[in-house]
Structure formats: structure tokens, C-alpha cells
Swiss-Prot record:
This is 5-oxoprolinase subunit A. NCBIfam families: PRK05406.1-2 (NF003813), PRK05406.1-3 (NF003814), PRK05406.1-5 (NF003816). The keyword Cytoplasm does not apply. The gene is pxpA. Catalyzes the cleavage of 5-oxoproline to form L-glutamate coupled to the hydrolysis of ATP to ADP and inorganic phosphate. Belongs to the LamB/PxpA family. Forms a complex composed of PxpA, PxpB and PxpC. It comes from the Bacteria.
């Protein structure tokens, strides 16, 4: 039986500001990435999100990003590899403390937004992320963009297990990278098209690029976005579609 992980970014609320549909989406995913306070989230939200995830028996990962609350961590920053190492170490360590305090065990680290995209094409950034993970806990998994040589090489260097990730509602360029969110066609807004793309990636191992060419994608985890108007409906559709197609949903080991 084919097995796939469904992951979602949660814990993105901040103080009085609510983001996402965390409670409603948790039943349909197998792992979550928790914002750690730099691009979103705060200590109370981190604790609450961890506790809810443990109640649902969902795997927990840190979602470190750039220190850019206003830009939600989606803007590139001119930072050194040393700074990236510090950012990841700081945020991941903070979430790990909350997970341990709640009696759980953290499973993975997935960089957020611009940090993720920069790491996918910048070996120095990817190296700094993998190095931080190695120094915190070498058994932590690294979630990174499928086919990214930067992620692959960094994971191999530090002997960190890489979980290659694909996106349900994002379009892909010919080189296998994601279409930038600054482009109008970055997101797939038609649910049926997104479902078709996900099944194609999981069952057949490829995705159609924006140019119409087939791009090989061997994904072990699929990212769902939890902050859209129909995010919960979409998550439930993917969950049920996988079940109907004999695809088992399970966090990576």
C-alpha cells in the first residue's frame, strides 16, 4: 500500500490575532509544523498548538522562519549562514521545550516561507539549517522541497533524514521549484485540479509544470495550507480521496 504524510502549518495566530483553522484541520493531517514566534505564533499559541496536536496523535515539527512578523516570513532577507543557524537553533529549541513539557516528542523541522525557498536553492542556507538540526537532535527529520539538491546534500552531510515534500495547491516550474507567490499562477485555486495534481504526484511520481512538461517528484509528504477560506474543506477532500484510492496517511518514521 502507498503511504504518504499530510502536513500542515499551524500555530500561526499571534496574541489577539487569529490565523488559520487549526482545530478543524487537525483530524485530517498526520503531522504539523508549528510557528515558533519569528514569523508568526507566540509562546501561548505554541503551547496550545502542541497540546492539541498530542490530543490528536499528530506528529509535531518546528516551523522556524525569518524574524519578519509584518511580512509573515515570506520576504527574502540578506542573512548569513551563521544567522540562519542561530534562527533555526533558537526557534526549534523553544518548540522542543514546549513539546517535552507536554510529554511529547518532536519529530521534525520544516523551514518556513522565504527561508524554505532560499534553502532549496542555496547550499549555504540549507547547510546551516541541517547543521542546527544535527546539533539539537540528529534524529529529527528535515522536511524540504522534493528534488532540491541543496537540501539533499545538506541532509547527507549531517546524516539527517530528509523527507521530500510536495505541495497540493502550488504550481511548479520546469526545474521542479515552486512558482513564486509573486506570480499570479502560483496557487492552484481549483480544488479539483489540486486533487488531480496530488494524486498524480503520489501515485505516478510526477507533476505537470506551468509549461506543461512532466517533472519527476518523489514526495514523501504533502503540504496543505490551513489558512485559506476553504482550507478545511480541501483538507477533508484530500484525506477522503487518499482513503478511497487505497493511500495510507501516516507521519514518516
Amino acid at each position: 500500500m502507498t503511504t504518504i504524510d499530510l502536513n500542515c502549518d499551524l500555530g500561526e495566530s499571534f496574541g489577539a490575532y487569529k490565523m488559520g483553522n487549526d482545530d478543524e484541520i487537525l483530524p485530517f493531517v498526520s503531522s504539523i509544523n508549528v510557528a515558533c514566534g519569528f514569523h508568526a505564533g507566540d509562546p501561548s499559541i505554541m503551547r496550545q498548538t502542541v497540546e492539541k496536536a498530542l490530543e490528536h496523535n499528530v506528529a509535531i515539527g518546528a516551523h522556524p522562519g525569518f524574524p519578519d512578523l509584518i511580512g509573515f516570513g515570506r520576504r527574502n532577507m540578506n542573512v548569513s549562514a551563521s544567522e540562519v543557524y542561530d534562527y533555526v537553533l533558537y526557534q526549534t529549541g523553544a518548540l522542543d521545550a514546549f513539546v517535552k513539557a507536554a510529554g511529547g516528542k518532536m519529530q521534525h523541522v520544516k523551514p518556513h516561507g522565504a527561508l524554505y525557498n532560499m534553502a532549496a536553492s542555496n547550499p549555504e542556507i540549507a547547510d546551516a539549517i541541517a547543521k542546527a538540526i544535527y546539533h539539537i537532535n540528529p534524529s529529527l527529520l528535515l522536511y524540504g522541497l522534493a528534488n532540491s539538491e541543496a537540501f539533499i546534500q545538506a541532509a547527507e552531510k549531517y546524516k539527517v533524514t530528509l523527507v521530500q515534500e510536495a505541495f497540493a495547491d502550488r504550481t511548479y516550474k520546469q526545474d521542479g521549484t515552486l512558482t513564486s507567490r509573486t506570480e499570479e499562477n502560483a496557487l492552484i485555486k481549483d480544488e479539483d485540479e489540486a486533487i488531480k495534481q496530488v494524486l498524480q504526484m503520489v501515485k505516478e511520481g510526477y507533476v505537470n509544470s506551468v509549461n506543461g512538461e512532466k517533472v519527476a517528484v518523489q514526495a514523501q509528504t504533502i503540504c496543505l495550507h490551513g489558512d485559506g477560506e476553504k482550507a478545511v474543506q480541501f483538507a477533508e477532500r484530500i484525506y477522503r480521496t487518499f482513503k478511497l484510492n487505497g493511500i495510507s496517511i501516516c507521519a514518516p518514521k
